[in-house]
């Protein structure tokens, strides 16, 4: 099984749509979690009905800048447990009966709302009874080296993120490739790049996968 998570920052853009189709064609994910789609269900269906996923949950955000899409193929036995504008939680059952939990997570982007993200993550843990992996854009980073900017890292926010992962028994899964997943696209000294997207999982999940 392959999992794909992408903050697409608006799927109404034709270039983004082409990029999504290309990624899906090349990576062949079984489950796909998209954030900041900026589309409701009708808009998503009109533009992306030909994507190779037979099942979907589309969550429209009251703010036009948000929105989630959680897509999966029939080949995976997946049951959605609950969802909000910031997450989708599902239970996956493998062919051998092994059960694990998958969360697509989108953290609140504003600094004053970070605590909402961590409360939500702790709340979701209460539904999990076994192996658990969380993928998405947490809108937070775990260490100072994950931010490249003229501005100082927010060490209190780093510590809060670490604490909630420890509390939920989740560990970072690491990455391969370019170290930053977001940029403010400003020139020169005003440019900021941060590693905001990641996967985290508990030991029960990493022991299996």
Residue ranges of model-derived segments:
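A shared catalytic/ligand-binding motif for oxyanion handling
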Residues: 1-209
């Amino acid at each position: 099984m392959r999992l794909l998570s992408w903050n697409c920052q608006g799927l109404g853009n034709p270039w983004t749509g082409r990029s999504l189709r290309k990624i899906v064609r090349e990576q062949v994910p079984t489950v796909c979690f998209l954030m900041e789609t900026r589309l409701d269900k009708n808009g998503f269906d009109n533009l992306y009905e030909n994507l190779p996923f037979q099942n979907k949950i589309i969550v429209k955000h009251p703010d036009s800048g948000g929105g989630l899409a959680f897509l999966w193929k029939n080949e995976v036995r997946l049951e959605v447990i609950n969802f909000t504008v910031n997450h989708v939680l599902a239970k996956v059952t493998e062919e051998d009966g092994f059960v694990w939990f998958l969360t697509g997570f989108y953290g609140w982007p504003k600094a004053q709302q970070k605590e909402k993200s961590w409360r939500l993550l702790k709340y979701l843990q209460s539904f999990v009874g076994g192996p658990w992996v969380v993928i998405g854009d947490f809108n937070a980073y775990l260490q100072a080296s994950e931010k490249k900017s003229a501005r100082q890292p927010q060490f209190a926010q780093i510590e809060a993120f670490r604490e909630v992962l420890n509390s939920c028994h989740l560990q970072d899964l690491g990455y391969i490739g370019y170290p930053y997943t977001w940029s403010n696209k400003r020139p020169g000294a005003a440019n900021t790049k941060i590693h905001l997207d990641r996967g985290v999982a508990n030991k029960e999940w990493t022991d299996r996968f």
